[in-house]
Amino acid sequence: MSAVINKETLQAKIAEALKAGKPRRFKQSVELIVVLKGVDLSKPENRINLLVELPHPPKPNKIAAFAHGAFEVSAKNAGVDSIITRDQVEGLSGNKRAIRKLAKQYDFFIAPPDLMPLLGRVVGPIFGPRGKMPEVVPPNVDVKSVVERLRKAVRVRFRNEPVVKVRIGSEGQSPKEILENALVVLEEVNRKFPLRQYLKDLYFKKTMGPPVKVRAVEALVK
């Protein structure tokens, strides 16, 4: 991967994005936008939806667990931010406003396999399109290790076009740290769609800042 990406150029563009725009009263996130070309999204095999663990997460993600019984105990011991019981899930049925609010409140959700049919029915229609469906934790998997991984993770996926938008940093982080986060995301995209063939453009931008464009010819080593 390091042989494909021009790291010096990307780090300079990240520094430019950090300086661009007016100062704000809050710490802005830094987003990576990857625009691909020649990807036919009508083919299911061309879709991306995966988790990538960042080496320098801008902040710990908030995680909630749909849980009951032994899994509830394990989730509490793993330090999740909230427990949502089976009864609470059933109480959400038909309440689209409450489900949308819940989806916004947490970055990731976890659940045991036996709750997934209920969750698919109650929250699936709203969680699914938002990329918020729970990560299923099988009985033989350590819940704490899953939570620790999700604290540092971002979801890399396509929506309705071959574009990936991912938060890779925030103001206060160095361009080098943000670059290293960007590289792990680009590496995963490159596994599925070799960037030399599919990359059109990259962009870096702060929450309220202008996008800084990186053309493919600049982003890739010749």
From Swiss-Prot:
It comes from Pyrobaculum aerophilum (strain ATCC 51768 / DSM 7523 / JCM 9630 / CIP 104966 / NBRC 100827 / IM2). InterPro entries: Ribosomal_uL1 (IPR002143), Ribosomal_uL1-like (IPR023674), Ribosomal_uL1/biogenesis (IPR028364), Ribosomal_uL1_3-a/b-sand (IPR016095), Ribosomal_uL1_arc (IPR023669), Ribosomal_uL1_CS (IPR023673). Part of the 50S ribosomal subunit. Binds directly to 23S rRNA. Probably involved in E site tRNA release. It holds the Pfam family Ribosomal_L1. Belongs to the universal ribosomal protein uL1 family. The keyword DNA-binding does not apply. GO terms for molecular function: rRNA binding; structural constituent of ribosome; tRNA binding. GO terms for cellular component: large ribosomal subunit. This is Large ribosomal subunit protein uL1. The gene is rpl1. Keywords: Repressor, Ribonucleoprotein, Ribosomal protein, RNA-binding, rRNA-binding, Translation regulation, tRNA-binding. GO terms for biological process: regulation of translation; translation. It comes from the Archaea. PROSITE patterns: RIBOSOMAL_L1. The keyword Transmembrane helix does not apply.
